[in-house]
Regions:
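Histidine-acidic metal/acid-base catalytic patches
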Residues: 1-52, 120, 166, 185-207, ...
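Active-site acidic/histidine proton-transfer and metal-coordination neighborhood
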Residues: 2-12, 77, 94-204, 214, ...
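Active-site beta-loop-alpha junctions enriched in small/polar residues
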Residues: 21-23, 59-63, 87-90, 135-137, ...
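A short acidic, helix-capping loop that chelates divalent metal ions and anchors anionic groups
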Residues: 26-29, 93-97, 138-143, 178-180, ...
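Glycine-rich, positively charged N-terminal anion/phosphate-binding segment
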Residues: 29-46, 65-85
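Glycine-rich, proline-tolerant flexible connector loops at the mouths of alpha/beta enzymes
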Residues: 55-76, 138-142
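Short glycine-enriched loops at secondary-structure junctions
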Residues: 84-91, 126
Length: 339
């Protein structure tokens, strides 16, 4: 289980987790002649072939159709641990109008109870991290919602699931929109406001790099704010063009911002896994090779972070807010001094 109480330890670069559904990509090649979607264990077996991968995140209830402890054992036999569970609110069609914020009390109760079952399942599987992405909680039209009432429902729901098991960490993953036009948890500041109102010690934030980008935030700044007012419980690395949730490979577009984020979370004492929330399945990429490249990319970036932290010139230039010098130093340490 993860221990987030000791904030003096540096980021452990050896724990890498990934999105299980990525390994359904190119199913016709991996499982020729098979009709239908691959099973959870088929995808897990494929993921286990990724060099350097240590963990998986499981969606609840989608990936958990058997005893959680038995599922954990099977994954352990493959050499994989469970980093955490992530809630999905698709089982009830009414959730399209909201999970914790649905206008009907019975639907809200269904969503909250489903989350509690997910927390119990995560604990049975040996994990103490539950990520909640409340993507259905939001609105699409002017005059659609009573904003104060909707916000109160959200706060009440989050508080109740936090109180269900105070030893389980609950991490809010924010996202500006999609599937709703406006999400109730769209950015770092709003999420931190909610966390302050909830007041639960086991509550924190998951930073998804692509979500942060199209929330028009600087990832390292968002991480610093969260560390100041709460804590980062999860880091989802990917990349994109800051217009939507592209799910591109790590460093494909925003290399410097990714390095800066890794430096920031290391300085703030993040101890969790680095999770790859990328979408190789959208275009049929080889998910094993894609994940291996992501791991190698982050390992190289962490070496750059090591060099940056050992270079007194950078700290001095940052203290002066001398952006020309900081860019020169970072580029030199990334690509070499020769030209």
């Amino acid at each position: 289980m993860h221990n987030f109480t000791n904030w003096t330890n540096a980021l452990n670069p050896t724990r890498f987790a990934t999105r299980l559904n990525s390994f359904a990509s190119g199913a016709h090649i991996a499982w020729p002649g098979q009709s239908g979607k691959p099973s959870v264990m088929q995808m897990a077996e494929r993921a286990a072939s990724v060099e350097g991968l240590t963990d998986l995140d499981l969606n609840y209830p989608d990936h958990v159709s058997e005893d959680p402890a038995e599922l954990s054992r099977k994954l352990g036999d493959l050499g994989l641990s469970i980093n955490g569970f992530a809630m999905r609110y698709y089982t009830n069609p009414a959730f399209k109008l909201g999970a914790f914020t649905h206008p009907a009390e019975d639907v809200r109760r269904d969503a909250i109870d489903l989350t509690k079952k997910g927390i119990d399942a995560a604990r049975e599987a040996g994990s103490n991290l539950m990520t909640i992405w409340l993507g259905q909680d939001g609105f699409d039209y002017a005059f659609q919602a009573d904003y104060a009432k909707m916000w109160q429902h959200e706060i009440d729901g989050i508080r109740e699931v936090c109180e269900h098991d105070t030893d389980c960490l609950i991490s809010i993953e924010y996202k500006p929109n999609e599937p709703r036009s406006y999400s109730l948890m769209p950015d770092a500041a709003t999420t931190l406001l909610a966390i302050k109102e909830v007041g639960a010690r086991n509550l924190g934030v998951t930073l998804d790099f692509a979500h942060v980008l199209y929330a028009d935030e600087q990832p390292a700044f968002a991480a610093a704010l969260i560390a100041r007012h709460s804590r980062v419980l999860g880091v989802h690395l990917n990349d994109g063009y800051a217009k939507r949730d592209d799910g591109l490979m790590v460093g494909a577009v925003h290399t410097l911002q990714t390095v800066e984020l890794l430096r920031q979370i290391r300085r703030d004492g993040y101890e969790g896994a680095i999770y790859f929330d990328t979408f190789p399945d959208l275009t049929g990429l080889d998910p094993v090779h894609e994940c291996e490249v992501n791991i190698r990319t982050v390992q190289r970036m962490l070496k750059v972070v090591d060099r940056l932290e050992q270079d007194n010139r950078l700290a001095s230039a940052i203290d002066r807010q001398d952006s020309v010098s900081t860019q020169a130093i970072v580029q030199e340490l990334m690509f070499g001094a020769d030209y």
